[in-house]
C-alpha cells in the first residue's frame, strides 16, 4: 500500500516556516527558552547565523522546530480546555505570535488533509495527529497560546545531529548540505519522540513523495 507523501507546496511551506523561525532566533529573546537542552556552543551558533546560512539550513525538508508533538501528556493538558478567549481582542500580534499561528495553521490543515505527510514533516504520532484534526484551528491556536509556550528546537537531545546541521547543513557544498538534511529526515522517521511502536516507519518506506535535491551554489571566482 502506497501512502501519499507531502506535496511540493508542503515542502515550500516547511522551508518558509523554517526560515521565519531561524530569522527570529537571531533577534527574539522569547524563543531562547526553546533552545534549552542544547549546549551553549550550539545555541550560540544557532543564534548567530548569516542570512545565507539561514537560507541553506531552512531548506531541510522537515520542520526544524517543534510544538512537542510527541508529548501526549503535554497535549492532553493543552487541549483539556479552559475559558475561551476572544482571539481578536488581544493586542496586535508580534512576529513570534505570527510564526505560531502560521505554523499551527499549516500543521492543522495537513493533519486533516494528509496525516502521513505530517509524520514526515514533524514526526507527529498517530494519536497527536488525530487529536489535532479534531479541533478547529481557532481552538488549537487558543489552546496553545494559553500555555504561554513557544516553539522549541527539534532534536534538542541529538547534539551530534545539530552539530552536523550547523556545519555541513549550512555549507556552500550542496552534497554536504543534502547529506546533513537527509540525516535529519532519517532521525524523524527512525526515532519517534515517544518511542512508540507504530507503523509509520513502514509508511515512510513506501510513501510517494516529491523528489528534492540540493544544487551546488555558484562560487564567486575561485573561492
Where do the model's predicted regions map?
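Structure-specific DNA junction-binding interface
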Residues: 1-80, 205, 213-214, 220
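Extended, low-complexity, amphipathic alpha-helical coiled-coil/linker regions that act as scaffolds
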Residues: 5-16, 38-40, 124, 128-169, ...
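Surface-exposed polar/charged interaction patches
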Residues: 27-31, 81, 110-113, 150, ...
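Amphipathic alpha-helical packing elements
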Residues: 32-36, 43-46, 96, 100-144, ...
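Long, compositionally biased
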Residues: 60-82, 146-190
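A short mid-domain helix/strand-loop element embedded in enzyme catalytic domains
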Residues: 80-86, 109, 138
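Membrane-interacting alpha-helical segments
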Residues: 84-102, 151-162
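Short, functional C-terminal segments
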Residues: 165-223
